[in-house]
Amino acid sequence: MPVIRFCDGSQQVYKHSVSLREIIENKKPNIIRSLIAISVNNSFSNFNTLITEDSSISFISKKDCEALNIIRYSCIQLLNYAAKKTWPSCKIGESEITKSGFYCDIDFENSITEEDFFILENNMKTLIKREYFISHQNISFDHAYEMFKKKSEIYKIHLIKKYINKKNKISLYYHENYFDIDMGMQVFNIKFCKYFKLQKIGGIYWKGDHKNKMLQRIYGTAWSTKKELDKHLSYINELKKRDHRKIGKLLNLYHMQKESPGMIFWHNNGWIIFNELEIFVREKLKEYKYKEVKTPLLIDKSIWQKSGHWDNYQDAIFTTSSENREYCIKPMNCPGHVQIFNCGLKSYRDLPIRMAEFGSCHRNESSGSLHGLMRIRNFTQDDAHIFCTQEQLRYEINNCIKMIYDLYSTFNFKKILVKFSTRPKKRIGDESVWDQAEKDLSDVLIENNLKFEHQEGEGAFYGPKIEFVLQDSLDRNWQCGTIQLDFYLPIRLRSFYIDEHNHQKIPIIIHRAILGSIERFIGILIEEFSGKLPTWLSPIQVVILSITDSHINYVKKIVQHFSDINIRVESDLRNEKIGFKIREHTLRQIPYILICGEKEIKSKKISVRTRNGYNLGIIDIDCFIKKLQKEIFTRSFYQMEE
């Protein structure tokens, strides 16, 4: 007499063995159509499973929160199955679900391209039309090993040998005659996987090691309904339109090339944006009483060994040598700032010392992880380190928070998420020091009325931290700002100051970043504004168009006037239709398009249009300049008449 317990807490007693189909028809007949998976005692089951003993049963429909992961795990095996049917010699590597879909790593004899997606997708759809049932089996380690060995699945053999105990059973899912290791529960019938789309392909070294073979990673997305899939694809299309790599090329901002992977070739337009951001941050540094410094690009390896960076980050550090000495190309600025602090005796009266740098840093990121401006090997940190006493700590944290929000407000980000990371299991320092540091950080956040997410155990081994995450208009999160306490580095690099009792004391270091990486922040801004940067950041702020050749001299005169007062201006004197010119410069995202014809010359005025299509009419030149200068000077987010 099996007792069946359901996930809603109810239970039912059956006088004899009973199939899952009977249980469903008795208990929840209305969910059969939407049912995608059934779990018996936390294991996969199907309609025909016979229950002979007391069991716990969960019915999973499309509406349940775990449904998406179940569909996506099923799509992973479906993709691998279709790949094996299409290219029988391919070898299946690792696969995983993602936030919006899944990916599969596959070793093909000959590389496939995105054009092959059409073939692969069609084969997946053909398999779905069969509406085959997915089955599940637990077998011995040795049996599974022999099965994968017979198929020459070298990557699967590696995975089971490394991650599965030989004494344990191995769980396999079967899609018809194709089997694979159980990564997560799957649907009981493949028909529930029809709302999917293959999206892109990339390269990935096996196990992330460049010494291993390069596999191809296929990314896909999968959803419960067509509506959800269409919504996601629409979102992806919007992302493609905003892609900073595409817009960067269109606006002639920068380029990258294979001879210098992960490095930026800034063109004049892009370098203007870079410099304007640097000028803006530099003004704030002065306002908040920071001292700007510059540290060397090459520093002897011994400094990085003393600081602990070599032990923890050496794989990411580029090195070079000269005259039998080994140097590190700096991956971060902090050890260099400590060297400046250590130069000369410091008194408690000298503290706090707020030291800032636009530091050019290099990190040896894997080639597969590089992505436009967002993930590069050479980047500029708007980095600062504050050397202070325990008594000054709260004020300095508060000052950092104020500065961070001051800068972010200029860019009109609607939502800033705050995360507070506390002590990890592996850490240095006394518990009392950690207690006080965490209290200082959390108290300052509370005093500033900032809601924050606790990230238990996510702090660095040398101190707790606060992260500031920008949420853009597409609800993507970008971690930019950080406030990180450090009790460790000043000890390792022997930093001290003389206190009021003439004793040596170790300062606390606050690591502070706001933009994070200037290059990455530019990428974020380009995508947030779809290339329509605020006027103060726009490489060209005004373009002046002539209608005919007879208007050229008037245009040149105005261009010279604008240039003399430091407005970034261009002219377009080509003998083209005015509508064509307007469209072209609108696509270039130039904030203001000025038109000069007979009417404008006679009135000694200009016709003004914005890149958003607003016609501001004929305006007095000095009046326009006054408004434009105010917009630029105040770093306004909005254009005239908006």
Swiss-Prot record:
CDD domains: ThrRS_anticodon, ThrRS_core. Keywords: Aminoacyl-tRNA synthetase, ATP-binding, Cytoplasm, Ligase, Metal-binding, Nucleotide-binding, Protein biosynthesis, RNA-binding, tRNA-binding, Zinc. One of its GO terms (molecular function) is tRNA binding. It catalyses: tRNA(Thr) + L-threonine + ATP = L-threonyl-tRNA(Thr) + AMP + diphosphate + H(+). GO terms for biological process: threonyl-tRNA aminoacylation. Its cofactor is Zn(2+). Zn(2+) binds at residues 334, 385, 511. GO terms for cellular component: cytosol. Pfam families: HGTP_anticodon, tRNA-synt_2b, tRNA_SAD. Catalyzes the attachment of threonine to tRNA(Thr) in a two-step reaction: L-threonine is first activated by ATP to form Thr-AMP and then transferred to the acceptor end of tRNA(Thr). Also edits incorrectly charged L-seryl-tRNA(Thr). This is Threonine--tRNA ligase. It comes from Buchnera aphidicola subsp. Schizaphis graminum (strain Sg).
